[in-house]
């Protein structure tokens, strides 16, 4: 009888700690090994039980988000699956399924965190009642967008991909967070520019969509770079910060 079989027996019949009934099968040495195996199993079960607490569940979810974000920093979205995420964590897919059912759920959670960081930076940089000029607004806002390029990559996948494969309950929670933050900045921007709330919201949306498009520009794709090289096409140089400043300057001048 193997140790694996023994562990299976202990799991099925609850033989934990007392192996007297199995002494006829194992030598003293094997019995000691078996006891160690059972100890590891019982400790593992205790760890599994703790993982079901709210605190430990949050810890596991943080590990999942961190692993997924690391993968997305170096891999195309299409190559990231629950399998690759589980492998990154050193988990089985079954363990991962205890916390999430789709990779989009993970990306939605990461997007929510990065979204909060972006809008909170804007609200902090532009305090209520400020008298910043359009030039100052342009420079500061472009700097914040530049510092949040990673979030812009997530934005580019939100509407067409991420939001289409999560539950309506999860999506509602995410949308509530978005509108709370976006409307807070909309109101602040409307005061700063002396324009309507609708116009201010349209401006911040235009900036968000332009930035998200630039953040995933095809020229950054190694495959596209190689294809252009083969046909002797040199793509224009890209400067994300400068491009955002130019766009913001133009967009703020046209406030309608």
Regions found by a protein language model. Name each.
Residues 109, 124-151, 203-207:
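Hydrophobic alpha-helical connector segments
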Residues 63, 71, 78-105, 109:
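Helix-turn-helix
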Residues 191-208:
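All-alpha amphipathic helical-bundle segments outside canonical DNA-binding/catalytic cores
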Residues 19, 30-75, 83-84, 129:
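Basic, helix-initiating cap at the start of DNA-binding domains
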Residues 10, 15, 23-45, 183-187, ...:
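C-terminal peripheral helix-coil segments that are non-catalytic and often amphipathic
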Residues 112-119:
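Short, basic, alpha-helical segments at the C-terminal edge of helix-turn-helix-like DNA-binding modules
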């Amino acid at each position: 009888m193997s140790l694996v079989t023994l562990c299976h027996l202990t799991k099925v019949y609850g033989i934990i700690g007392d192996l007297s009934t199995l002494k006829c099968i194992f030598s003293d040495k094997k019995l000691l090994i078996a006891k160690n195996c059972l100890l590891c199993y019982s400790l593992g079960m205790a760890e599994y039980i703790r993982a079901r607490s709210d605190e430990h569940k949050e810890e596991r979810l943080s590990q999942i988000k961190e692993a997924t974000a690391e993968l997305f920093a170096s891999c195309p979205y299409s190559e990231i699956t629950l399998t690759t995420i589980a492998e990154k964590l050193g988990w089985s897919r079954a363990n991962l399924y205890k916390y999430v059912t789709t990779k989009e759920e993970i990306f939605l959670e990461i997007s929510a965190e990065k979204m909060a960081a972006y809008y909170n930076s804007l609200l902090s940089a532009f305090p209520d009642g400020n008298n910043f000029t359009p030039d100052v607004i342009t420079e500061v806002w472009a700097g914040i967008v530049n510092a949040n390029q990673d979030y812009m990559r997530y934005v580019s996948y939100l509407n067409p991909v991420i939001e289409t494969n999560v539950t309506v309950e999860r999506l509602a929670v995410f949308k509530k967070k978005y509108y709370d933050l976006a409307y807070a900045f909309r109101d602040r921007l409307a005061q700063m520019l002396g324009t309507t709330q609708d116009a201010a919201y349209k401006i911040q949306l235009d900036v968000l969509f332009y930035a998200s498009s630039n953040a995933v520009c095809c020229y950054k794709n190694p495959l596209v770079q190689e294809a252009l090289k083969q046909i002797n096409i040199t793509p224009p140089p890209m400067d994300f910060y400068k491009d955002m400043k130019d766009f913001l300057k133009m967009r703020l001048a046209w406030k309608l």
